[in-house]
Regions:
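Membrane-proximal helix-turn-helix segments that form the acceptor-binding/catalytic region
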Residues: 96, 114, 121-125, 152-171
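Conserved donor-binding/catalytic core segment of Leloir-type glycosyltransferases
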Residues: 199, 217-234, 239-243, 255
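Nucleotide-activated donor-binding/catalytic signature segment of Leloir-type glycosyltransferases, i.e.
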Residues: 257, 264-292
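A short, well-ordered alpha-helix in the C-terminal region of glycosyltransferases
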Residues: 363, 370-385
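Acidic donor-binding loop of glycosyltransferase active sites
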Residues: 169, 294-311, 326
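Carbohydrate-associated surface elements
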Residues: 37, 177, 195-198
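N-terminal subdomain of nucleotide-sugar transferases
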Residues: 1-57, 248, 405
């Protein structure tokens, strides 16, 4: 079966779509990926790529077509708008100029949802069944991260999103709560299929971890580790307030592994509060290095700001930490806390409740190591039963294969 995958992001950028494409190829399908020149997350093209021209290459056994795109730069609003719409323009232009005749069309919907337009255009030409894996809810996620808040713009985006959902036959959703938000925008013909995210193999099968590789970077003590993007959604103001409340617990160390547009602001706040002995920023490292950091953590931290949109989602790091067998401390609302509590793999606090977060960290620090270890094992068992990569890829692949042309 010929499957067209439309995604703005693809290898060497690190997203779940890479695994899914490989999984579809492994099942014997002929896969074509329509994407752009890689530039995420640093905002500039990876080595070997430039703006002009269309690149064609083979990755994971799939044919990969890369159209031009304006790189996202520093991630500010105007540059992101140019980045998003340039991919829409060049991907649709490619579709209009080339004959693509897939049997199925699959769109990967992390922000921006607008990338689906190229897939919709191929659907209009061929009537091939159309499916999409919804990773972010638009336009709510744009508003919640502070990128766009003007009511007029939000109204236009809502109309565009409504028009996109209307065209799809199947909507895979990474959180069950997504369905409610989508249906608030209208009644669509799409079938909803719950397809949660999985963790990368290096977390589920962490073989040959170099325990000493980064040991000298990790302060001694009870380590609360955050790993990932330091952005508006992560509410570092509240994280730092929680760290401040644990200042007198001298052996509690908050370790931040990651990068993002709010890092400088967060570091300035740490300096202002004189928390240099409590909070350590280590910067960004490649994903394959993460197990060498995680292994030194006592608990892993998951945080999202107090926004309705964030209460509907399960941040991917939840599955990652569960897969790695680490207990979790959270400060967020909704679905992710339900999962942590159901699995019995950590301590939950509501979004913005830095006092509860601090209390949970102190509680975890005072627990016997074997109790924390049991929590981590609970998380891994829950992950294997509900979120494993093979289970989710098989579910998505079978649904795509069984779609019927109208």
């Amino acid at each position: 079966m010929k499957i067209l995958v439309v995604t703005q992001y693809f290898y060497p950028e690190e997203f779940k779509i890479n695994d899914l494409v490989k999984g579809l190829v492994d099942r014997g399908h002929e896969v074509v990926v329509l994407t752009c020149k890689p530039n995420y997350p640093k905002g500039k093209f990876y080595k070997g790529y430039k703006f002009w021209g269309v690149n064609e290459e083979t990755l994971y056994g799939a044919k990969v077509i890369r159209v031009p795109v304006i790189p996202r730069g520093n991630g500010k609003s105007l540059r992101l708008v140019l980045n998003y719409f340039s991919f829409v323009f060049f991907s649709c232009l490619y579709v209009l100029c080339h004959r693509l005749r897939p049997d199925r069309i699959f769109c990967w919907d992390t922000s921006p949802i607008l990338q689906a337009y190229a897939g919709m255009l191929v659907n209009k030409q061929t009537k091939a069944p159309l499916s999409m894996w919804v990773q972010d809810l638009w336009p709510e996620s744009v508003s919640a991260t502070g990128k766009i808040r003007q009511k007029g713009v939000m109204s236009i985006l809502t109309t565009m999103v409504r028009g996109i959902y209307k065209r799809f036959d199947v909507l895979f959703i990474q959180s069950r709560n997504f369905r409610k938000s989508i249906e608030e925008k209208g009644h669509f013909k799409a079938e909803y299929v719950y397809a949660p995210n999985w963790a990368e193999d290096l977390y589920t099968e962490p073989n040959n971890i170099d325990l000493d590789k980064y040991r000298n970077l990790i302060p001694s003590g009870f380590v609360v580790m955050f790993a990932g993007n330091i952005g508006a959604a992560q509410d570092f103001g509240s994280i730092i307030k929680a760290a401040e409340l644990t200042r007198d617990e001298k052996d509690i160390k908050w370790v931040i592994v990651g990068e993002g547009r709010k890092r400088a602001e967060a570091q300035a706040l740490v300096e202002q509060k004189k928390l240099g002995n409590t909070v350590t920023f280590l910067g960004r490292y490649l994903s394959y290095d993460m197990p060498s950091f995680f292994v030194h953590a006592d608990v892993m931290l998951v945080v999202l700001r107090d926004e309705y949109i964030f209460s509907l989602t399960i941040p991917a790091k939840t599955q990652t930490y569960m897969a790695f067998g680490k207990p979790i401390v959270s400060m967020l609302n909704g679905e992710s806390n339900k999962v942590i509590e159901e699995a019995g793999c950590g301590f939950t606090a509501n979004a913005g409740d830095f006092k509860a977060l601090a209390a949970n960290v102190i509680k975890a620090k005072n627990m016997p190591k074997e109790v924390l270890s049991r929590m981590g094992n609970n998380g891994r068992k829950y992950y294997d039963a509900n979120f494993s990569k093979k289970r989710v890829i098989d579910l998505i692949a079978k649904k795509i294969e069984n779609q019927q042309k109208p």
